[in-house]
């Protein structure tokens, strides 16, 4: 899932507490999306994506929001054999 794809690599390669703190917001966001996905089954998420059906939000919104972060971490992730969101 998102938490496994985004948070696990950060935690696994973070040698210093400062890195863990820096990545904490991403963990919160991923966890929030997971909870929203469970709670709202067919209701559009107005704040995150007003014009996108709820079913597409858990996939589209986090990926779009995380794209710059994924790009920034790609060399590190690839170097360690991690796959973001299950994609290698």
UniProtKB/Swiss-Prot annotation:
Molecular function terms from GO: structural constituent of cuticle
Ranges for the Sequence repeats: 7-10, 48-51, 55-58, 60-63, 66-69
Keyword Ubl conjugation applies: no
Key words, A-Z: Cuticle, Repeat
Domain notes: The tetrapeptide (A-A-P-[AV]) repeats found throughout the protein are also present in many proteins constituting the protective envelope of other species.
Known role: Component of the cuticle of migratory locust which contains more than 100 different structural proteins.
Additional detail: The sequence shown here is that of isoform LM-70A.
Name assigned to this protein: Cuticle protein 70, isoforms A and B
Organism: Locusta migratoria
């Amino acid at each position: 899932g998102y938490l496994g794809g985004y948070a696990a690599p950060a935690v696994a390669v973070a040698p210093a507490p400062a890195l863990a703190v820096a990545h904490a917001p991403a963990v919160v966001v991923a966890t929030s999306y997971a909870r929203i996905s469970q709670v709202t089954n067919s209701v559009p998420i107005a704040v995150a994506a007003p014009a996108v059906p709820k079913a597409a939000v858990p996939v589209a919104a986090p990926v779009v929001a995380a794209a710059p972060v994924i790009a920034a971490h790609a060399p590190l992730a690839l170097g360690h054999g991690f796959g973001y969101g299950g994609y290698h």
